[in-house]
């Protein structure tokens, strides 16, 4: 936990993530248990920026759950919580994005990593989502559905919440 803040935005490697997400997503680890262990760690070794950021990420996870309780099906509309028109969708461009054949080396490497491993760092998830939405003009819902089909740590609440945020169609319209 002490190093988490310094490594949390890494793109690849073994140290860029807590590796909790597959366990949390499958229900094999509860957020409550993770939090209890985090507090025990802090009691023994002291709090740090890293342990704070782990706690903060657990809060984001809960925040996305509360969004679903409040807004329900609205979160799945093309406009999300906003009033924007439905995004365009170019099936050919979306297919290239899914296969990692966009011509953008970092985006392509990230998408091929996802296909090969079922995992991608949080920072790369944000990057490829932004690329689909802002550079390709793609439909954020198609990207969210692709992540649902590919991620080993898929969590409906976090996935939908993050895609809405990046698309500027959630509670923060800036995206």
What are the roles of these predicted feature ranges?
Residues 117-119, 140:
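Conserved helix-adjacent loop modules within structured domains
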Residues 134-143:
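Short glycine/threonine-rich loop-to-helix capping motif typified by GTGT followed
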């Amino acid at each position: 936990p002490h190093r988490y803040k310094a490594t949390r935005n890494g793109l690849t490697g073994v140290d860029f993530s807590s590796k909790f997400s597959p366990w949390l997503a499958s229900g094999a680890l509860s957020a409550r248990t993770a939090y209890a262990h985090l507090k025990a760690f802090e009691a023994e070794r002291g709090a740090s920026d890293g342990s704070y950021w782990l706690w903060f990420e657990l809060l984001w996870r809960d925040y996305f759950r509360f969004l679903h309780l409040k807004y329900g099906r609205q979160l799945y509309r093309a406009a999300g919580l906003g009033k924007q028109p439905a995004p365009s969708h170019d099936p050919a461009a979306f297919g290239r994005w899914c296969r990692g054949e966009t011509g953008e080396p970092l985006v392509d490497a990230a998408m091929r990593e996802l296909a090969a491993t079922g995992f991608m760092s949080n920072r790369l998830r944000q990057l490829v989502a932004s690329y689909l939405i802002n550079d390709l003009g793609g439909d954020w819902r198609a990207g969210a559905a692709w992540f649902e089909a590919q991620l080993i740590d898929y969590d409906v609440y976090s996935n939908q919440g993050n895609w809405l945020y990046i698309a500027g169609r959630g509670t923060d319209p800036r995206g």
